[in-house]
Amino acid sequence: MYFDKDNSMSPRPLLPSDEQKLNINLLTKKEKFSHLDPHYDAKATPQRSTSNRNVGDLLLEKRTAKPMIQKALTNTDNFIEMYHNQQRKNLDDDTIKEVMINDENGKTVASTNDGRYDNDYDNNDINDQKTLDNIAGSPHMEKNRNKVKIEHDSSSQKPIAKESSKAQKNIIKKGIKDFKFGSVIGDGAYSTVMLATSIDTKKRYAAKVLNKEYLIRQKKVKYVSIEKTALQKLNNSPSVVRLFSTFQDESSLYFLLEYAPNGDFLSLMKKYGSLDETCARYYAAQIIDAIDYLHSNGIIHRDIKPENILLDGEMKIKLTDFGTAKLLNPTNNSVSKPEYDLSTRSKSFVGTAEYVSPELLNDSFTDYRCDIWAFGCILFQMIAGKPPFKATNEYLTFQKVMKVQYAFTPGFPLIIRDLVKKILVKNLDRRLTISQIKEHHFFKDLNFKDGSVWSKTPPEIKPYKINAKSMQAMPSGSDRKLVKKSVNTLGKSHLVTQRSASSPSVEETTHSTLYNNNTHASTESEISIKKRPTDERTAQILENARKGINNRKNQPGKRTPSGAASAALAASAALTKKTMQSYPTSSSKSSRSSSPATTSRPGTYKRTSSTESKPFAKSPPLSASVLSSKVPMPPYTPPMSPPMTPYDTYQMTPPYTTKQQDYSDTAIAAPKPCISKQNVKNSTDSPLMNKQDIQWSFYLKNINEHVLRTEKLDFVTTNYDILEKKMLKLNGSLLDPQLFGKPRHTFLSQVARSGGEVTGFRNDPTMTAYSKTEDTYYSKNIIDLQLLEDDYRIEGGDLSELLTNRSGEGYKCNQNSSPMKDDDKSESNNKGSSVFSGKIKKLFHPTSAAETLSSSDEKTKYYKRTIVMTSFGRFLVFAKRRQPNPVTNLKYELEYDINLRQQGTKIKELIIPLEMGTNHIVVIQTPYKSFLLSTDKKTTSKLFTVLKKILNSNTNKIEKELLQRNQKVIERRTSSSGRAIPKDLPTSKSPSPKPRTHSQSPSISKHNSFSESINSAKSNRSSRIFETFINAKEQNSKKHAAPVPLTSKLVNGLPKRQVTVGLGLNTGTNFKNSSAKSKRS
């Protein structure tokens, strides 16, 4: 079919020649009108032929039997009024308001037939295209509900404005041709914001350009219609960006918005890093008041962030980007004062990761309180300069938001800190409402009802600096108004009334009009809430709590734990009682000592029963049942005890003791720090055997020994000298495992006792004074490698590869490449003029770790082995055979049996720099050999956990050995007459030292490190003196210095009598004289 010039349909079909003629005519008309005045109306120009339109659209329109009307390239329904100066003076504000864009036709764009917003609708492309047409405005002038009607004069072809009243107004409509588009000032998810300047008035606007094809393809038409509806609804507010006009062309849709020349709020914070308290108060008040205005008009923004807060020419905030807003339906039929239910939930996942609320992530819903959460995040960012929930990616950010995991920066103002802590709350019912935020002490000098937050001059922008005023705490009683008024009610408690808006011309009207006291209503009404009836379970818990309080009042002398802890302790006591009944063979004393609640490492001070007397007392470790139950832990959890070593296996008795105060039923407090005469039974020593115990029962000593863990890993045995050389070349070190907790000796004492090497055995007292044979530490069985499986028989490589975590191939390549480098070195050494020769070349061209280690002569191979750790402190190393052993009928052959509980055996973790490689190596050190275990990170952590259990379960056994050893050393010392007896070691046979001016701790007498380090040689004297000094500094309380004698009592500069001075020295002239004096005495 063919369309004539008068838009009448012709039955003749459309021919290709017709299309060519129409295109030629179109170009001719375009050239003809290109030189005309730009104010010439677009409707007066000849229209483009409708034969160039989509054929599918034509067929669809034919079915609907609608008259085919040509559509202009630029729609001019929504316009910017352009008055002459004389006409503007004669028009009042109401008349200007009448001809503005505020047409009611746009307000129902996103609504359905029943008038409800935000509902799903058909996403058909044709419906989307019609929706876009409606957003830009209908082409039918007579359908508009404006009071101004536009008609065309056939003679002049210029628009004439006719009003239903007698007054007439000359209005010039503007389209896309009337603006000059400049640079891009913003970019959104599906739009681009450009600077548009009016050609006539030179006034600048922000033109938001949206691609219609993209909107239809990505199903974003709904968001565009919501944004226009929200902007039209809030168009008269100073806190929201104004929408002046909407128009379109064939490819794009245009929103002509208010231009904010000072950019967004995020750029301001990035420029200054942070904002001081005055600026934060000024902008926070405007933001929270703008959010209140949105909620009072039934709009939830749902994407409030600094990027969506603009700054106008007066440095006041403007909210923008309402594409993801939630439009609430009014609950009443009142047009003047509609009410909205803010508790309406939405399940749409919208927002930005750093500002999204936790209820959306945890419970997949959100309501009006998501805007309050975002406000709290922005307030935090104003001071800290970064959002409270920030991570490297969105997933980690969401994890922090879900857990409400954030930390205040140092020097954060205490008043703002209090406000942020009450806003960023996971529980919605405990989160502050807008009315409570406005009543907070932070906004005490502001009045939100008279609009003064918008009329005040903005303060000077300055970054935040800590000062004495910011560190002032919240005044007492200032937050009484913030007592929660329970916002968890539904229905009327969330009904808000629409707040009145001011005139669109903010400059010509006062701010008090916007916030009229008669029409203003707070977002959350303060309504008293009826108490919910308590259920039976809650009533029973409350009754038990009352009974417990009454019992404690009746028994003032007996203190019992309260709250959830008492319930957990009662459960622990019941469990202990049940265990005692199931095993009647054990005595009551042993059962009490075996309880995890009563077992505590010696030296731990008792927790006082009164928290007021010692508020900083450390809490002792709780029982296993308490830890397993969901009970809040105490504010301080003591570190785990470190492994037992020859220097710290024996716990020092503190110089002061406190009287023990028992709790009821269970002993939470640690026992007195004295040596127990009862054998402490380990929790792992259970009489019941498990599956692993039965499998390895041939190698277990008795039924009480149990298998704690089995693992297959790389195993290597080496001497300490070899290991030390390889570690020195790798800059590695052996340290106490981090899982064992804080070591009880300082780094200085480690250096002193190891002769300058932290991990060595040089000058170790255990090796010089009281050495043991190799069999006491481990036993070794010879195995035939030919009988083993291939995995256990084939060597894995050298120890160097194990330390640097290098594969065999890579290591061989390094070995093959090393001769080439040696040749190069020899050639460079022959050149005498070469600058990089000898040591200088080694300095600038260091060799790799594998090359350095491969140059050593010692080769130590590692193999695959299976290790078994038992509750008796045994570390068994097995090799797997191809055929079962004919004697034992087992496929595993025992190679090493290491005693982990033997004094002198240490558990270490080998650490090397990252550039040398990565490994996870456990080292078991003995004075003779070192055993290295290599596995992955997860298994290494589990191994250290089991090793810690083993070491901590043998405290009393080591204490007994130390006492016996001390007694033997004392006997040996007293039998020799020519050997000096240190005064720090008390014994019944040794002469008592002369009285000192300060109290001496008895702890030194029980430590064997000094007694074992005694040597008759004079060369060892300095090491003994330094050892005594280290032990005294670590274990004893602070001693008072001895008084300096008077000069009259000095003989040749020395006192007449022996006076003990620092470092364990006395004033005797030499060691022999002191011993001689002791004989005479």
Swiss-Prot record:
Domain called Protein kinase: residue spans: 179-443
Range of residues in the leader sequence: none
Listed InterPro entries: Kinase-like_dom_sf (IPR011009), PDPK1 (IPR039046), Prot_kinase_dom (IPR000719), Protein_kinase_ATP_BS (IPR017441), Ser/Thr_kinase_AS (IPR008271), Ser_Thr_kinase_AGC (IPR050236)
Basic and acidic residues bias (residue ranges): 527-538
Source taxon at top rank: Eukaryota
Residue segments, region Disordered: 494-652, 805-833, 970-1017
Ranges of biased composition (kind: Polar residues): 494-526, 805-819, 998-1017
Bias (Pro residues) ranges: 632-645
Coiled coil: none
Disulfide pattern: none
EC annotation from Swiss-Prot or TrEMBL: 2.7.11.1
One GO BP annotation of this record: positive regulation of cytoplasmic mRNA processing body assembly
In-chain residues carrying the UniProt-annotated modification Phosphoserine: 138, 619, 1009
Gene3D superfamilies in alphabetical order: Phosphorylase Kinase, domain 1, Transferase(Phosphotransferase) domain 1
Top EC class, one word: transferase
Knocked-out gene: effects: Long-term depletion of PKH2 in a PKH1 null mutant (Pkh depletion) induces programmed cell death. This is mediated by the lack of Pkh-dependent activation of the PKC1 downstream signaling cascade and results in accumulation of reactive oxygen species (ROS) and DNA fragmentation.
GO annotation, cellular component aspect: cell cortex; nucleus
SMART domains found in the cross-reference section: S_TKc (SM00220)
Keywords for this protein: ATP-binding, Cytoplasm, Endocytosis, Kinase, Nucleotide-binding, Nucleus, Phosphoprotein, Serine/threonine-protein kinase, Transferase
Reaction it catalyzes: L-seryl-[protein] + ATP = O-phospho-L-seryl-[protein] + ADP + H(+); L-threonyl-[protein] + ATP = O-phospho-L-threonyl-[protein] + ADP + H(+)
Region annotation (PIF-pocket) ranges: 210-255
Comp. bias (Low complexity): 564-575, 582-602
Major subcellular site: nucleus
Record remark: domains: The PIF-pocket is a small lobe in the catalytic domain required by the enzyme for the binding to the hydrophobic motif of its substrates. It is an allosteric regulatory site that can accommodate small compounds acting as allosteric inhibitors.
UniProt family annotation: Belongs to the protein kinase superfamily. AGC Ser/Thr protein kinase family. PDPK1 subfamily.
This protein's name: Serine/threonine-protein kinase PKH2
